[in-house]
């Protein structure tokens, strides 16, 4: 992409001079974008996306449900073997089938249990925490595994090491859009599932606990909407 991130000088975020140094020395950019039209299924990688109060447009429009309530890949891990995408007219698809089709219903029952079904997502339960999840390339590299295990919406490039641990409370400006970073995300058993083979490795979650305090990537929300694209430069600021 032509980006050559520069190592920032690390220091206390309480020092405004250090904050200015960071803003001047980090060359940040959008490294990847993801959307998950069907909650808990594998998602789709994007070249550009519109973001707003509900996160990435088209994200988590449909969910899997069972008699007990919302059903996810935390327990029904084979759901991660299905792919949620959006059609050209904005309809959620499961492996290319309309979400409300008999074909999609059969796939979900096969992966998530015979008593599972699909339904439009309830706004109150649409997102586990906040509408966006922001990962950084430095933390993903330290994690040492496929970024798909973390299910981010935005991957920020040009971040050295675990710099994201100092980002809660910061804001990212990407073109017109502004994103507020709230907190580090506590990780769940979905990270233990290989996105290609669906093999489970409990050691992955234990490793996240040991090396990252159980938290990777950042919960975030959109302060000002806009359209963002892979390669767009990012400016980070701290309001402290």
Write out the residue ranges for each language-model feature.
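Metal-cofactor-dependent catalytic cores
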Residues: 3, 10, 14-240
């Amino acid at each position: 992409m032509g980006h050559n991130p520069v190592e920032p000088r690390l220091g206390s975020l309480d020092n405004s001079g250090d904050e200015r140094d960071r803003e001047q020395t980090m060359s940040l950019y959008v490294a990847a974008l993801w959307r998950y039209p069907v909650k808990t299924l594998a998602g789709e990688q994007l070249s550009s996306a519109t973001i707003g109060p509900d996160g990435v447009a088209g994200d988590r429009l449909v969910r899997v449900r069972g008699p007990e309530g919302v059903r996810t890949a935390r327990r029904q891990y084979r759901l991660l073997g299905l792919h949620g995408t959006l059609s050209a007219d904005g309809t959620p698809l499961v492996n290319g089938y309309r979400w409300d089709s008999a074909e999609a219903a059969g796939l979900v029952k096969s992966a998530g249990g015979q008593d599972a079904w699909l339904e439009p997502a309830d706004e109150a339960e649409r997102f586990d925490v906040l509408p966006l999840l922001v990962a950084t390339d430095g933390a993903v590299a330290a994690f040492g595994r496929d970024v798909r295990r973390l299910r981010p919406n935005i991957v920020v490039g040009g971040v050295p090491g675990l710099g994201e641990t100092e980002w809660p409370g910061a804001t990212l400006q990407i073109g017109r859009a502004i994103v507020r970073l709230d907190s580090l995300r506590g990780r769940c058993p979905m990270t233990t599932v290989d996105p290609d083979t669906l093999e489970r490795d409990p050691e992955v979650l234990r490793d996240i606990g040991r090396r990252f305090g159980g938290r990777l990537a950042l919960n975030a929300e959109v302060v000002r909407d806009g359209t963002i694209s892979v390669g767009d430069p990012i400016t980070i600021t701290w309001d402290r």
